């Protein structure tokens, strides 16, 4: 491609609203342009990268025995009602009506559509197993789109769905896709890690893993063991819990009786630490929640945070929300910040870590007062004991006896789920087994955020000058840059190199613009083509410069050697 004919509007400075490195560089390199919040146009160079991503995914999906389909983005609301997700999904689901007042949704996922397809086409065990996939635009009405393609309202996704006759078949399908994801992300040049995760709104009873691209900008926190292979999203991560009854024990006489202390306007844990000189791990934090509309008190240590996903799972609640100020003050009889476990008339859920403390400080359910010397299970009744907090740095690993948890940030680029019969039972997607009995198909689903992968790659592969594309994703493989468009000899040699490289099967960009050399070189570094061949003053002697973008190295070679070196670099 001749650069003079290419729509490649590079920018010297990124727009001020671009927060992440990938967003800034993708705007500056002319890959994308914003149409509205969370909605982007892919310009020609960005589209080339996207197509290469899609090609890798298609190749690996085909290798894994999957078959490609293409499903509608607009889905009847009735299908979502059949699965039970229409109301549960929440405001992120984009809903609309046609002129006949029929309800539809713009698909964030396609579990309902694919299940509807399969229940109409598959009715025998002889037709199983089968795995179908598509590459399709998805929609999600994000409350706060940000970071460019990392959190958008319209995005590209690969979603696959497996259908098996039994759980053994699902386990095999899941492993096959898990392995395919390893190959895909490795080929994309990502530094990634699969982690245990929560199934979220997609659900299913068989477990799930997220594939996390490690990056400081990531919105997810990963808890990983420093000794074993355990890793989990913070939403899911556990911690080592002592065996047996971990509640504090011992002679009550050894502990002072609870005493009420005056703490005027001291509402937060850090304020309480400062006022009393006690450490946060010797305090209880009491929060009121509504679980399916019913109030519960949740208690964690003062230095810990409630994990609402774990809490909802423990309570088996479809809807969980923090109680508002009016509800909290009505239940406790005190202002916000003074809630405590003693005397509450609602169920009390206590985290394991909070149960193990001998004597603590807690809210008194009286404005401007706290209790000291409170003992969990002695001075208040525990309705339920469980893991309802976020794991923290230094917690014991739940998977091994010696490891400690450490935290890092990650970008979720893919997720695999064992759905089981969640959708097939709800939507009656059944088949006849060898004995003629009707059974629900066993499902799995597997997603990759393609546009998010593109951003994650840029987050990991860049320097101060611009993007450094991995070889399989680079929009072009070679960038031929004559220093002066006015120098006929340089242009002739550059043109011949361009033609020879194209004939050899390489994707080549020729910078034939009449621009200053500095502008050309900055643009070349910015867009990140792996090899740049500079045709300059030494062209008259048959010498050009080969510069390797990812290595930061350069060498002078003859024009005859250039093609051979390019071949060797790309392994062709």
What does each of the following model-derived ranges do?
Residues 1-572:
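NTP/phosphate- and nucleic-acid-binding module
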């Amino acid at each position: 491609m001749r650069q003079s004919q290419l729509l490649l509007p590079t920018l010297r400075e990124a727009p001020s609203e671009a927060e992440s490195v990938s967003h800034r560089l993708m705007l500056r390199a002319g890959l994308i342009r914003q149409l509205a919040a969370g909605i982007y146009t892919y310009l020609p160079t960005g589209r080339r990268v996207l197509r290469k991503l899609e090609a890798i995914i298609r190749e690996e999906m085909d290798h894994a025995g999957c078959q490609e389909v293409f499903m509608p983005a607009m889905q009847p609301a009735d299908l979502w009602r059949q699965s039970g997700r229409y109301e549960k999904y929440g405001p992120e689901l984009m809903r609309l009506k046609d002129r006949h007042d029929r309800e539809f949704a713009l698909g964030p996922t396609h579990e309902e559509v694919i299940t509807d397809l399969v229940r109409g086409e598959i009715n025998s065990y002889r037709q199983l197993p089968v795995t179908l996939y598509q590459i399709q635009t998805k929609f999600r009405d994000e409350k706060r789109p940000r970071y460019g393609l990392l959190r958008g309202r319209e995005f590209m996704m690969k979603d696959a769905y497996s259908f098996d006759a039994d759980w053994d078949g699902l386990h095999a399908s899941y492993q096959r896709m898990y392995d395919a994801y390893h190959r895909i992300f490795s080929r994309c040049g990502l530094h990634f890690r699969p982690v245990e995760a929560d199934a979220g709104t997609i659900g299913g009873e068989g477990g799930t893993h997220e594939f996390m691209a490690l990056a400081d900008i990531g919105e997810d926190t990963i808890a990983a063991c420093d000794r074993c292979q355990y890793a989990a999203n913070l939403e899911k991560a556990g911690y080592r819990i002592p065996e047996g009854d971990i509640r504090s024990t011992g002679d009550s006489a050894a502990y002072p009786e609870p005493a009420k202390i005056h703490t005027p306007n001291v509402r937060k844990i850090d304020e309480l630490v400062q006022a009393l000189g006690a450490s946060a791990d010797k305090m209880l934090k009491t929060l009121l929640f509504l679980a399916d509309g019913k109030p519960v008190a949740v208690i964690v240590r003062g230095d810990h945070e409630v994990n609402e996903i774990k809490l909802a799972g423990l309570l088996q609640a479809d809807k969980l929300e923090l109680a508002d100020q009016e509800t909290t003050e009505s239940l406790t009889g005190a202002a916000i910040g003074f809630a405590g476990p003693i005397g509450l008339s609602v169920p009390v859920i206590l985290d394991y870590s909070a149960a193990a403390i001998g004597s603590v400080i807690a809210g008194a359910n009286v404005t401007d007062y706290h209790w000291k010397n409170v003992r969990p299970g002695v001075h208040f009744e525990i309705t339920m004991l469980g893991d309802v907090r976020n794991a923290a740095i230094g917690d014991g690993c739940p998977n091994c006896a010696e490891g400690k948890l450490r935290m890092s940030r990650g970008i979720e680029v893919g997720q695999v789920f064992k759905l089981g019969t969640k959708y097939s039972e709800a939507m009656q997607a059944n088949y006849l087994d060898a004995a003629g009995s009707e059974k629900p198909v066993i499902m799995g689903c597997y997603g990759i955020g393609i546009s998010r992968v593109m951003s994650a790659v840029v987050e990991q592969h860049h320097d101060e000058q611009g993007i450094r594309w991995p070889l399989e994703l680079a929009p072009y493989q070679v960038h031929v840059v004559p220093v002066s468009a006015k120098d006929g000899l340089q242009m002739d040699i550059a043109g011949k190199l361009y033609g020879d490289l194209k004939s050899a099967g390489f994707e080549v960009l020729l910078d034939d613009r009449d621009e200053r050399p500095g502008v050309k070189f900055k643009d070349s570094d910015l867009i990140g083509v792996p090899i740049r061949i500079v045709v300059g003053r030494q062209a008259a002697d048959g010498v050009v410069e080969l510069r390797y973008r990812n290595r930061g190295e350069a060498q002078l070679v003859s024009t005859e050697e250039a093609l051979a070196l390019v071949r060797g670099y790309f392994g062709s």
